């Protein structure tokens, strides 16, 4: 028997597979913390919701990305509920203890349980490949998975892809990365090590953290012994005995919207892991017998597209803790966190050191609305903001707050047949409870 022809191009293969059609009130693309929050909130309030996710788990960087902990904060009832319900699932000394430490396996299960409770339809292993438009009006998204292609028509589409893939394909205006040169923050592949003596272990949780040993200071030793562009130590406690999460790989000059660059970044980071473990064993107290037990299936992309919204949040807004009339996130707090775009550590220009947040700030609803597109909401780190402002609001708790707002707005618009631009932020805040 002759083998099937191998010259059929991808486009021809796609055209040969099954085609389906679905209709829903709200379509959320991407199930990271912001996408989960948007889908859960919209469904909990009574909207029919479909949540599309390319990975095999809900949670994005918080689960598939093996994130160590929730960092940053905002006033978000849903975020607090996640922490509370996670504590109930934790075991041992962390049982019923509210902590920002993440157990990715427990969190995966919790996300699924919560979505099931509110009747959200979930489509895993599914990629958004095109946008269905009528002029500037977004009608839905075309997705593809093992079953074939599906046109999903929605009254409101929420882009929670992190990179703004839906908005970009719809033609929404954006810039990549830093305004001056379009360079973006580096990528990281998280991993965990076991065999750690946690009673003796050193945990350095920031680039500014240092620790002197007989062999030298640990950050300096990391720069010396871990090959560039890695060269720092960031280690975090877990809820598991003897297990530590490492945020220590580093890939620079990466465009997270480019598949080739994502592959390159993954290979770069994975090749660094053995050298990192060797460094930990040789120089860091408590890690003498450590070994890799797991690594992320999703690489951590910190920055890609910044969209032009009805309003673009800037660093001065954050520094002044401006209270916008149309705020939908309040008391957002983090530091300006620009990782070194050319190597390990923080941005070598030190520019973020000139920006010190003193109190919580607000995010206006207008940042979620692309300037020229209808029926589409930006959600999570791809809302409208400058490079520097983005380095502050990109963290997961703040993204959960943004997701709650997006889900609330989508619910109102879809179930009351209203335009996203007509919604008063007070209505959104009332639903969220802030």
Report the location of each language-model feature.
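Flavin (FAD/FMN)-binding glycine-rich loop and adjacent Rossmann-like elements that form
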Residues: 61, 82, 125, 145, ...
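Conserved beta-strand-loop-beta-strand element in the redox core of flavoprotein oxidoreductases
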Residues: 132-151
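Cationic, low-complexity basic patches in intrinsically disordered or flexible, solvent-exposed regions
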Residues: 3
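N-terminal Rossmann-fold NAD(P) dinucleotide-binding loop
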Residues: 35
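Beta1/beta-strand and adjacent pyrophosphate-binding region of the FAD-binding site
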Residues: 20-32
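Membrane-embedded transmembrane-helix bundle of lipid-linked glycan/lipid transferases
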Residues: 27-29, 38, 43, 136-137
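Conserved hydrophobic helix-helix packing surfaces used for dimerization/oligomerization
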Residues: 26-28, 49, 376
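Conserved N-terminal/central alpha/beta ligand/cofactor-binding core
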Residues: 10-15, 41, 47-48, 52-134, ...
């Amino acid at each position: 028997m002759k083998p099937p022809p191998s010259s059929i191009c991808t486009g021809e293969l796609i055209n040969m597979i099954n085609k389906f059609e679905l209709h829903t009130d709200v379509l959320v693309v991407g199930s990271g913390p912001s996408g989960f929050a948007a889908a859960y909130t919209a469904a909990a309030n009574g909207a029919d919701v479909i949540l599309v996710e390319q990975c095999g788990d809900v949670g994005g960087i918080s689960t598939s990305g093996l994130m160590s902990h929730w960092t940053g904060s905002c006033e978000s009832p849903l975020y607090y509920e996640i922490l509370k319900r996670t504590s109930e699932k934790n075991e041992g000394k962390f049982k019923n203890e509210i902590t920002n430490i993440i157990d990715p396996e427990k969190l995966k299960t919790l996300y699924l349980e919560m979505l099931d409770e509110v009747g959200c339809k979930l489509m895993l292993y599914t990629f958004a490949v095109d946008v269905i438009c009528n002029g500037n009006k977004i009608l839905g998204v075309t997705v593809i998975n093992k079953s074939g292609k599906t046109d999903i028509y929605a009254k409101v589409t929420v882009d929670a892809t992190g990179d703004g893939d839906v908005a970009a394909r719809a033609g929404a205006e954006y810039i990549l990365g830093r305004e001056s040169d379009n360079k973006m923050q580096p990528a990281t592949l998280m991993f965990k090590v076991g065999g750690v003596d946690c009673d003796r272990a050193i945990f350095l949780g920031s680039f500014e953290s240092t620790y002197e040993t007989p062999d030298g200071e640990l950050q300096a030793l990391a720069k010396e012994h871990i090959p560039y562009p890695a060269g720092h130590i960031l280690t975090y406690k877990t809820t598991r005995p003897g297990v530590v999460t490492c945020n220590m790989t580093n890939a620079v000059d990466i465009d997270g919207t480019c598949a080739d660059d994502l592959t390159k970044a993954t290979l770069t980071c994975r090749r660094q892991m053995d050298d990192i473990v060797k460094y930990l064993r040789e120089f860091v107290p408590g890690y003498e017998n450590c070994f890799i037990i797991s690594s992320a299936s999703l690489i951590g992309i910190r920055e890609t597209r910044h969209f032009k919204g009805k309003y673009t949040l800037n660093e001065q807004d954050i520094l002044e803790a401006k209270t916008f009339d149309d705020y939908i996130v309040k008391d957002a707090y983090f530091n300006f966190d620009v990782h070194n775009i050319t190597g390990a550590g923080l941005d070598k220009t030190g520019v973020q050191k000139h920006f010190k947040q003193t109190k919580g700030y607000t995010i206006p609803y207008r940042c979620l609305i692309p300037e020229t597109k209808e029926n589409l909401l930006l959600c999570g780190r791809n809302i409208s903001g400058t490079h520097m402002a983005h380095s502050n609001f990109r963290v997961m708790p703040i993204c959960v707050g943004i997701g709650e707002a997006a889900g609330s707005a989508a619910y109102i618009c879809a179930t009351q047949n209203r335009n996203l631009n007509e919604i008063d932020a007070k209505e959104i805040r009332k639903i969220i409870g802030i």
